[in-house]
Amino acid sequence: MATQTVGRIYSQHGDAVRTVPLQLPDALKTPPADAAPAAAASPPQLTYRNGPLIAAVEVFTLFWGPEWQSSQAALATQINGFFDFILTSPLIDQLAEYSAGSHAIGHGKRTGTTTIVTPALKHSVSDTAIQHMLQTEISTNAALPKPSPNTLYFIYMPPGVKVVQGGSASCTGFCGYHNDISGQIFYAVMPYPGCSGCTGGLALLDALTSTSSHELCESITDPIPGQGWYDDANGEIGDICAWKTKKVGTYTVQLEWSNKQNKCV
C-alpha cells in the first residue's frame, strides 16, 4: 500500500534526521530477482558536527487531548513509567561513547507531566501549530519547566489526529520525529500509532516505547538535527537501526548505532 512504501521525508538538511520512518513489509525490502546488483554501501559512521548535545536529559511529557484523562489515561501512566525507568538504564549508558567536549552524556530523569486540553485538536495538526502550543504552554503554564540545555519535551497525540511535518504526515510518511525551536527548545512528537506501518507488529505500548526510545536517543545525540552526531548517508543514531528492537527491563526499545562496535546494539 502507498502508506507503507514511504520510508523517509526530506527537507533542507533531510528530515530523515528527525523521523522514525514507517516499517516496510519484507516484500518491499527485497529487490526484484532481475534487479542489478547494488554497489556495496560504505558502513555507517556518525561524525560529530560540533553542535549541542543533551548531557543529562530532563524529559517532560505533554499529553495533548482530553482522551489522555479518560480512555488513554492508563497508557499515559505507562509511558511515564517507561521514562522513569529508561532514563537511568543501560540504554542511556550506551550513549556515553558520543560524549564530546564538555558534553558528558549520562543518566537523566523525568521532571514532570501534564495534559493539554486547549487548544482543542482537530483531525490534523501541523508542526508549526505544535511549536506554537509548546511555546505558549512554556510561557503561561506553570506546570512546564522552562527550557534548558537538558530539557526535552515529549508531546503525545491522541488517536485519530494526523501530524503534518516537512511535507509529509504521520502514518503515511513517519511515525515520530524530534526537532528544535531556534536551537533553544528541544522537543519530540509522538503521533498515536494508528497504522500497521507504525506498530511494526508490536503491541501498542511496545510500539510507542520503541519509537520514543528512537527519538530520545536521537534528541540526546543530535538535538539540533544535523548539528550533533550525524551520518550524511544514513541519518541519526536511530535511523540506522530503525525497527530493530530489544528489551531493556520489561520495555521494548529500539537498537541504536554504535560507532565503537560498528553495529546496532
Where are these regions (language model features)?
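Loop/turn elements at helix/coil->beta-strand transitions in domains of secreted/extracellular proteins
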Residues: A55-V59, S148-Y153, G183-F186
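Active-site-proximal segments of metallohydrolase catalytic domains
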Residues: H107-D180
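Metalloprotease/metallohydrolase-associated module, dominated by Zn2+-dependent proteases
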Residues: G166-D206, D222-V265
